[in-house]
Amino acid sequence: RVEQKLFVERKQRVVFGARWDQEKQPQFFMDLAQAYKQKHPETEFAICSGGPLRSNNEYYVDEAKHLANEGIITINENLQKNDYYNILADSRVLFNCALQDWTSNTVSEADALGCNVLFPAYRSFPEVFSNDHTRMYVPWSQQDAMSKLEILLSKPSPSMGQISDWTDSTIDRMIDIMTGKGEQWRRDGPHYR
């Protein structure tokens, strides 16, 4: 069982829960952590890994270890699932900077555990977040990510807990579109842009 804390009692922590591989953009997370901690040194930036921290590009592992030695980030390795859930339940933001994802498990897990989520407004994420601009940042914009992060570290999103409901409906909308009964859900025309 995972015990959730009230949002105001949670650590000022930003979690990276994705694989530490190049397509997940770990460099953006590390750059963000360095820049944000200059202004807010009390904020913890934590990497969570189910095994030893590894990557398809060893540079990212080396750089993460260097930043951990500098006190910029924390590396949590060899976590069991409940250990990870306990970290999420005591954190304020799950941060993602992936170039691609569909419905990320990390999104649903964090949202269910009362942890805000912040993802790039890219590929499938706008649909996952129902175009909630408060939980998405302009891709590759450190400035936008930092300003959204500051807000999400201070208070829970009013949309907290709605991601799973929206995702369930996404499958129904996709089937409606494929069977010709979902024109109102299409997002490929000028009315959507």
For every predicted segment, state its role:
Residues 3-24, 30-33, 46:
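Conserved donor-binding/catalytic core segment of Leloir-type glycosyltransferases
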Residues 86-91:
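Short alpha-helical donor nucleotide-sugar binding micro-motif in glycosyltransferases
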Residues 58-79:
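Nucleotide-activated donor-binding/catalytic signature segment of Leloir-type glycosyltransferases, i.e.
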Residues 98-100:
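Aromatic "clamp/platform" in nucleotide-sugar-dependent glycosyltransferases that forms part
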Residues 116-119:
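Short hydrophobic beta-strand element within catalytic cores of glycosyltransferases
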Residues 154-193:
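A charged, aromatic-enriched C-terminal amphipathic alpha-helix characteristic of glycosyltransferases
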Residues 85, 107-112, 126-127:
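Short alpha-helical segment that forms part of, or immediately flanks, the ligand-binding pocket
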